[in-house]
Amino acid sequence: MAKNDKIIIRGAREHNLKNIDLTIPRDSLVVMTGLSGSGKSSLAFDTIFADGQRRYMESLSSYARMFLGQMEKPDVDSIEGLSPAISIDQKTTSKNPRSTVGTVTEIYDYLRLMYARIGVPHCPVCGREIKQQTVDEIVDKVLELPERTKFQVLAPVVRGRKGEHQKEFEAARKSGFSRVRADGIAYDLNEKITLEKNKKHSIEIVVDRLVMKDGIKSRLTESIETAGTLTGGLVYIDVIDGEELHFSQSYACPEHGVSIEDLSPRMFSFTNPYGACPKCTGIGSSLRVDPDLIMPNAGLSIRNGAIKASGWNYAEGTIAAMYIDALAEKHGFSVDQPVSELSDEAVNEIMYGTHGEKILIKRPKQQGGGQFYTDFEGIAANLERRYAETNSQYSRDTIEEFMSEVECPECHGERLNKAALSVTVGGRNIMEFCRMSVTEALNFVNGLELTPREAMIAKQILKEIKSRLGFLQSVGLEYLTLARSAGTLSGGESQRIRLATQIGSSLTGVLYILDEPSIGLHQRDNDKLIATLRRLRDLGNTLIVVEHDEDTMCAADWIVDIGPGAGVHGGEVIYSGEVSGLLKCKNSITGQYLSGKLKIPVPEKRRKPSDKWLHVIGASENNLRNINVDVPLGIFTCVTGVSGSGKSSLVNEIIYKHLVAKLNRARTRPGRFTDMTGSEYLDKVIMIDQSPIGRTPRSNPATYTGVFNDIRDLFSQTNEAKAKGYGPGRFSFNIKGGRCEACEGDGIIKIEMHFLPDVFVPCEVCKGHRYNRETLDVRYKGKNIFEVLDMTVSEGVEFFANIPKIYNKLKTLEEVGLGYIKIGQSSTTLSGGEAQRIKLAAELAKRSTGKTIYILDEPTTGLHTADVRKLIEILQKLTDGGNTVLVIEHNLDVIKTADYLIDMGPEGGSGGGTVIASGTPEEVAANPVSYTGAYLKKLL
């Protein structure tokens, strides 16, 4: 490699990197791989990307840098051959409710332009097409009437308005007109015209009366101009003994007078007041009090606490109880009946009140007795009013617990106002276009029939829309709709959307750094993704991809393996070169799995489903097609299927949310389904995802697993601590007493530098040890509390071998492959895969009831094949305890080791939503319709 076609890294020491030197080719597809926690991300993101970004930032003026987040220089001696860097990772999905697939990919911006330039407006009331016509066009149209036709030119000054309208008649008289037509009847303006005040009327001024013959063109033009001036552009031509013609010089319905402003792109923007629905301000939904959250358990009676809303609990003698008793008397129900037995009218009045109807309230004897009549506001209505009126954030937060998102009643979730939604291209409005899947949208755009003028205007716009839709298709996202909210996308989907957007921008000479773009992608769509990565490379860019997927590794021009282990045992370059060389590398675990020397074994026998099943009936959330699904309990089940087939809708939206509401009493609203049976065999549901175990530097594996409490208890039992009277709280860095107060137990102090990045320096008082001197003097087996937290988990296992309480928790962490992390390592430095395994370890350490269902969504994210092997062992262990494990997964190694599979499909989006196959992996592999089965066959 010549010097200018490579990136040379010298002395990289960020995180666990061990002063490594590395040379990689530019304009190539480079894959970085290695065990979870080996240092791949530290090299790719925290070193190469961070430095590329920092150098670009430093080329800007100090004034501009003030407004940008400052970048720290990574711990590296030098990097040569670096380009401006763009990182496409998992984490930066927009949580803005206004962000959609259309806005993120910029397709929506081009759509707004297209609808503004070639859209056809319609009347929002009657739906008829509205045309904008000049005076000359109107005159030419009228001149087409047959010779000798009698007609009059009318100016519609009042259309369907109540009133006597004497002002309008007076103004017409003063302007010199002599006739009007009111409600279809002709009147002379010299006579007195009386109209009913409370009826709607339509009034037209007769501007001129004409007979069609040669030479009337100039008089007709003048009359039409006069009529247009009086009405803002509306003109009626009343043909005697014929039909009436309506014309408009602006975008207005001649029938209803509803006018639409000139079409502009801002009119179709739901982030702009000109286009957004006035009710929901363009979000498409609003927060409303949800009766199902006020009374979540219809099996309870009101006396036993069916009503959960604060202030409305049925405690004898409260005003709430008096209202409920009055309603019970009115509707003939008892407060000891289950709510499910109450009539709809009764429940409706409990929620939304009596609408002004008075009910008899009886005051209890202990409150003085007596009775009075009053109306009742209703619990839901009361909460809505209090929510709207209160200024207290606490009150709003409390009431929000009983609210859920509901479709906006004005725009029905379409986000735009009526005028914008009445403009069409090819017979569809902009939101109907956005509701189509990418494939349908592409077919629609390709099939548009335009006039030569429209085709000329829209040529460039359509080219951009087609290419961007094509890129979304090429990264396997053809099932998404442009209206889909960006916040509902999975990490892999949002990353591939940004990948498609980058291809659309056609930059060259850029360094792209990607974090596992294959996440959430079925094997079937992998080839599309690889072709997309190559396309980005062929534009003249360098791609560094952190990836564990075998297909992507084999497609790389260059591969870098970081290892050999994880954490303190990693941080070295094991191999750097072409893929063929990695297969022969004896030191590389990756190479051994790639070449087939190491394999994850297929289990010799699988667990059989018992007679305990979870039956989901009529699941219809998102794209699910009213399906029935049976999930066996007590075994390890995997839900598979292509991206967008409905796996997450079934597992996360319906099964998890229903069970967490029922078993854990959480306030969530599950997706749409008819019924679910079998939950009586379960006592709790646990979702184990890759979200951080804590969001502050103070949370760590020790605090999450609870082992820190045991360690603090142990230190407080030492003779030294007892002599000084120290309790367990003395050894906490979160509360005053034992911690160093100079840094408040953080061990580091932040110094703001304004134009330069903030600098974090070790605390001068405690030297980064977090505790004060007296606390650090207390030792157990020669180590103080800071030194214990600074040990790796494996060191801790040896150190605490004779303290079962601590040993067991640390041993489980070691068993899940986390022996290398420090006991007190800050949770903000842990990867998603590490956080997930800490959660699994915490579960394994608990005493099992055998009635828990564990739900995991793509747990292999960020995991090397060797880590996947450990993960499978943990899942099998959890299942051995009699628990149920339900996993959504694309990784074939996990799929082949499951006891039972539920394969969704056949396609994504509108082409999915059904169960294609279910049974053991062998049974699914034998199914000719299943895509998953076809790939499984090769492994079994």
Label every model-predicted segment.
Residues 1-940:
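Conserved phosphate-binding elements of NTP-dependent enzyme cores
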